[in-house]
């Protein structure tokens, strides 16, 4: 394992030690009572009792010490409670948490984080902390924060870790369901690094048959290394990341924003479903041009200037905008501008899952007037791949633009905006012009009995 000799930190996936498919009771034997490192200084590898009382923590601590690196692992934490003294205590007398643990290079436990936003059926197995935990840890190579999977879509704890606690790096165990066009793991996680100007180390479980795939090491200027595959084989990814990710290199373009004219949807626009949300689209009918679209005549608008190498007769592209409360498999308020390839030549296919594209864009600039500071830019290309050196974005994010002619066909480009303060708003109503037969796209959650650890990451010391 010579590749680990100069590594600073390694990150393993969510549920990488246990796999999925548990009930609350069947998960219990895999849990350990993890102490709070803020209250207790503990090195399990140097504790004579730990091997018998906490065998998982003991082995992890010794691995970190043996290989002289920081170790980030997702596991289960259990905390006994009594209903007579704790009104929130579950009926079975224990709290169970999806938990990240971090050990330093000497084996000392330095961080423990309980997942704030369990995903769907996971809520039947683990508890949600009563208040969000903002967990950071300091290293010789920067300040880190950590959260898990579905947490990335919400304000707490993710956003304050960057804005208030000033972390430069995020370590992110996940079991992310890879859903194009806007929720592909490599696209969304890379966009979070760009939008929040941090390094983002994402270790995803690799079970392609249930849509778990896509891991990477991302900086504010793009992916340093990533892996996405539908084969059964996982991959180790190793990359060097900057200690100070907010120091953008000279020459990075910053585009001045211009106001998009508000207007009605117009006859050329149409609605279509994208992962449960009714986007307003305009088709790209010519090989080059400029399009504007505003959501229902509001001030939430998108503009696209583009030029294709060739307008292919077998592929259709559309510019889309959405402003509303997303309620499919979670509730969160979105404001999005996106340029997407449609599945077919029918307008109703715009927003459905597409994995391949042949149309090459010479250039494009996507601009959004989204009314939020939280915008995450992403570009996906043919085969669900990234083009990190071929496009850039403004800071703050209002524009996304190509730096050169793209080398692959374009699947999607997006400015993914979040209005966190509106997440508890009323459920949206269906637009009257959309027929009830509009196609719906859903993620179906499957569980597997055993999951091997196959994605983990190292950031080499500079």
What do these predicted regions represent?
Residues 46, 82, 90, 150, ...:
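Secreted/luminal cysteine- and crosslink-motif detector
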Residues 26-28, 424, 456-459:
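Residue-level recognition of conserved structural "scaffold" positions that shape functional pockets
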Residues 436-462:
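Cleavable C-terminal sorting propeptides in eukaryotic secreted/cell-surface proteins
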Residues 49, 58, 62, 66-67, ...:
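Active-site catalytic loop in hydrolytic enzyme cores
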Residues 2-106, 176-199, 204-209, 325-326, ...:
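Cys-nucleophile CN-hydrolase/nitrilase-fold catalytic domain and related Cys-dependent amidase chemistry
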Residues 13, 155-158, 173, 377, ...:
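Proline-rich low-complexity regions
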Residues 204-439:
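C-terminal beta-strand edge segments of enzyme domains
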């Amino acid at each position: 394992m010579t590749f680990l000799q100069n590594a600073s930190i390694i990150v393993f996936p969510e549920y990488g030690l246990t796999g999925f498919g548990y009930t609350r009771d069947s998960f219990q034997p895999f849990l350990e009572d993890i102490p709070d490192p803020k209250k207790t200084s503990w090195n399990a590898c140097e504790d004579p009792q730990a091997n018998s009382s906490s065998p998982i923590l003991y082995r992890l601590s010794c691995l970190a010490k043996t290989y002289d690196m920081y170790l980030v692992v997702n596991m289960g934490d259990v905390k006994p409670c009594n209903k007579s003294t704790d009104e929130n205590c579950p009926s079975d007398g224990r709290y169970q948490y999806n938990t990240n643990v971090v050990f330093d290079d000497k084996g000392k436990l330095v961080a423990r984080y309980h997942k704030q936003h369990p995903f769907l059926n996971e809520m039947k197995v683990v508890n949600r902390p009563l208040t969000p935990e903002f967990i950071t840890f300091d290293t010789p190579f920067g300040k880190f924060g950590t959260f898990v999977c579905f947490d990335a879509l919400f304000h707490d704890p993710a956003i304050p870790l960057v804005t208030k606690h000033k972390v430069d790096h995020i370590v992110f165990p996940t079991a992310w369901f890879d859903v194009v066009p806007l929720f592909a793991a490599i696209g969304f996680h890379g966009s979070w690094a760009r939008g929040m100007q941090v390094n983002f180390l994402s270790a995803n479980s690799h079970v392609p048959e249930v849509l778990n795939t896509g891991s990477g090491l991302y900086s504010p200027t793009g992916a340093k290394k990533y892996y996405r595959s539908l084969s059964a084989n996982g991959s180790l990814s190793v990359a060097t990341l900057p200690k100070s990710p907010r120091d953008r290199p000279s020459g990075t373009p910053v585009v001045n924003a211009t106001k998009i004219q508000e207007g009605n949807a117009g006859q050329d626009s149409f609605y279509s479903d994208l992962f449960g949300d009714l986007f307003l689209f305009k088709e790209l009918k010519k090989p080059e041009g400029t399009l504007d679209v505003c959501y229902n005549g509001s001030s939430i608008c998108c503009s696209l200037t583009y030029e294709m190498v060739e307008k292919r007769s077998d592929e259709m592209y559309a510019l889309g905008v959405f402003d509303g409360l997303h309620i499919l498999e979670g509730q969160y308020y979105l404001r999005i501008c996106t340029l997407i390839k449609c599945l077919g030549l029918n307008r109703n296919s715009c927003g459905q899952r597409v994995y391949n594209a042949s149309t090459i864009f010479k250039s494009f600039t996507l601009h959004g007037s989204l009314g939020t500071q939280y915008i995450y830019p992403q570009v996906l290309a043919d085969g669900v791949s990234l083009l990190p050196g071929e496009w850039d974005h403004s800071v703050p994010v209002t524009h996304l633009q190509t730096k050169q002619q793209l080398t692959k066909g374009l699947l999607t480009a997006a400015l993914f905006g979040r209005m966190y303060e509106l997440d508890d708003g009323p459920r949206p109503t269906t637009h009257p012009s959309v027929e009830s037969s509009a196609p719906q796209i859903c993620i179906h959650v499957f569980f597997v009995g055993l999951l091997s650890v196959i994605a983990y990451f190292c950031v080499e010391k500079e």
